[in-house]
Amino acid sequence: MHFTSQQHLDDGVLEREFALGEIPGILWTPASASAPVPLILLGQPPLGLRKMYPRLVARARHSAAEGFATATIELPGSGARPRWPAVEQARADLRRAMDAGEPVSDEIIDALILPLVEKAVPEWQAALDALLSLPEVGGPVGYSGGVISIGIRLAVVEPRIVAASFFAGSFVPRAMFEEARQITIPLHVLLQWDDEGNDRQAALDLFDAFNSKEKSLHANMGGHTGVPQFAGDAAAQFFTRHLKVRPGRQTGSRG
């Protein structure tokens, strides 16, 4: 990993763009940090870092104010990364089905999501290796947002992640429900009740499948982009509980 640019934002947060091989990413660290700080991995939809930047930097600033470093990486096939023909075809099939008012088949969902999970999760793990080697970044580590299936796989295979905040707003292959049953870390799940592109019952079934002793579902009225401001405050409180180590207190257990 090497840094390609850096700037101090107006609130003092240090923003550094980096490259991990062909994978672009961004790291944000608090201005006031005098010791290694906990890290939150910021998931994002496959729309590209540049398009998602305003939302990502807002999340990063909010987290920095709570004493967390945050980082994100460009997903495979997104942004400036090479196109991925199979996934592009699946996206076209998805748009065609939704425009026609037809149910989205399991085959389309599998073709859209499963290859992304298989490729993105090892990339996230490689990024985590590199980020935790930096003197200013320490543990514990949390994961927040993005494609929920990527978060599920990461929570299953990556022991350094001790807590996760998921957004139940994307299609989930049936195979991921089995993986969800293996998750035991604390979870904070956000659901937009009127999300036009999300199967509400499937989201509730997925929440039920999580095997975590501590899991909370935060449902708000409104569509996919209508997440209220206070929802971010609740997620911040969740990570403060589980990533800020206090004397005599353990971080979230993996079971």
Regions found by a protein language model. Give the residues of each.
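N-terminal cap/lid segment of alpha/beta-hydrolase-fold proteins
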Residues: 1-38
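Short beta-strand/loop motif that positions the catalytic acidic residue
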Residues: 183, 189-191
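Primarily recognizes the serine-hydrolase "nucleophile elbow" in alpha/beta-hydrolase
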Residues: 118-182
